[in-house]
Amino acid sequence: MNVRVRGIYTTALTELLGGEYDIVQASPPIQRRFEASFPVAVADATVRTSDDRLGAGIAGTADAVDAVGETLSALGRDTFRWTDPAPRGAVFYGEVTETLGSGAVVDLGTVDGDSVEGFLPYNRVEGYVDEGDSYRVQVASPEPPWGDARPSLATALRIPGGLVELRRGSEGGLSETARMADLLPVDPPEGWTPNWSRAADDASLEAMEAALRRASDRAETVMEAVVDADRDEPGRIVAPQAGAWLLFGRESRFELDEYRRQIETTMPGHHRTKAATTAASAAVDFAEALCEPDGAFPFDVVTRQFGPTEGDDVTISHGKPDGRTISLGRGEVTDRDPEAESITVEREMSGGGTYDAIGVKREAGDIATTTFVEGRWWYPTVYCSADGERRGTYVNICTPLEVFPDTVRYVDLHVDVVKGPDGDVRRVDDDELDAAVEAGEISEPLAERAREVAAAIKKAL
C-alpha cells in the first residue's frame, strides 16, 4: 500500500509508516534526511497536516484510509480519529440556508446520522445566490471537526489525485509532462482534462498511466452517480475517495518526537512547539541546527518567547471526544510559574444559572480562577464571589494539557470531580464516559486513565 505524507509531521510519520507501508512522492528534504530514494508512484492514501497543525487528515481509497488511520490511532492514548463525512471530492446536493459577505452556508444533509454543512464562495457559482437556492456542489477543501470552518465547496467538478487531477471542461496543460501524457495508452473520460502535478515530472510512464487510470475510474463513478441522482433534499450523492481526521494530543506529539529523533536531531517538544504557533517553526529548526537538544520540554523558554505570559489573554479550548471544540471563554493570565510549568487564568463570570454539578447560583462578578499545568491530565477551577467567598471547585479530567500562546488545549474526558462550598466532594459524569467508550469515541485505555485520575483527585480533595 502506497502512502504520501506532507506537513510538519512528515519526518516522524514517514519513519512511523515506512515500516508498514511504501512511502511515495517524498519531498527532496525527506529524501535527504532518510538518505533514500522514494518512488514516484500512485498514492493509495495521502496524510497531510491540518492547517492548524493540531492533527492530520487522511484521503484516499476506503481501505487505505482505514488501515493508515488504524496505524496512526495507535500512536498514543490521546490520539483521536473521526471519519470525514465530507471528504475532498465528495459531491452533494445542497440547499443554501444563509448568505454571508463572501459566500453562502449550504446544508448538505446528513451522513451516517451527522448533519453536514459547507461554505460556497460566491466566485465559484454563476449568478445571484439566495437562501433556498439548491446546487450540486463538490467539496474542494475539507475541514477537521475540531475547527470552526466549514468545508469549502465549488460547483465545478474535479477529481482529486496526487499525480493528476481531472477537471471538467478545462483546457489541457502545455508542460513537458502533459505532452508526455499524450503517449499513455489510456485516455480520460470524454469532457475531462488531466492536470498533472509537479510530482508527475519525475514519474515514470507506468506511474502516470496508473494515476490517470485511477482518476478516470473515479470520474466515471462520479458522473454515473450524478446522472442517477434523483433527489430534492440535501444529501451526499457520491464520494470518490474516503477521508478521516486525526487529532494528536500532547503525548502523541512527544511520541512523534521519538520517531523523528531516529532520523534527525529533535528537541524535546519539537512537534508540540511547532503545533502551538507558526512563529516557533524557524526557532525550533535553528535550535536543533546549533546543538543536540536533550532533557525536558523547555516550558519556560517557549512560553517566555511566544507566550502566554502575565497579562496575556488566553482562550480555553474545550475539545469533545466527538470532534467538536467549544470555547469556555477567555481569561487573563495572572501568573506564569516556569518551575511548575503552569499558568493561572482568571475570568469574570456573568450572572444567571448555576455552576455545573456544584449547584450553586452563579452571580455577576464572580471570579473563576483556573490553574493549567503543562502535561497534566486535569485542571482545577475555583469559583469565588466578588468579595472572595468560595462557591466551589470543579476539577476537569482531560487529555494532557497543552499551553499554547493564545489558548489552552485538551480533550475533555467527561468524568469530573467537584467540591461544593460545604466541602462535599463528588465524582460526576461517569455515565457519560461509559457512553463515549460504548460509542467508540474514547478508547478503553484512555477511559481507564481518566477513571484513575478522577479517583486520585477525589481522594486528594
Swiss-Prot record:
Q: Where is the S1 motif domain?
A: 89-158
Q: Spell out the family assignment given in the record's similarity comment.
A: Belongs to the FAU-1 family.
| Function noted in UniProt | Probable RNase involved in rRNA stability through maturation and/or degradation of precursor rRNAs. Binds to RNA in loop regions with AU-rich sequences.
Q: Which UniProt keywords apply?
A: Endonuclease, Hydrolase, Nuclease, RNA-binding, rRNA processing
The name under which this protein is listed is Probable ribonuclease FAU-1
- EC number, as in UniProt: 3.1.26.-
Gene Ontology MF, one: mRNA 3'-UTR AU-rich region binding
Q: What GO biological process terms are annotated to this protein in UniProt?
A: rRNA processing
Lineage start: Archaea, Methanobacteriati, Methanobacteriota, Stenosarchaea group, Halobacteria
**In its keyword annotation, does this UniProt entry include NADP?**
no
Which HAMAP family does the record cross-reference, listed alphabetically? RNA_binding_AU_1
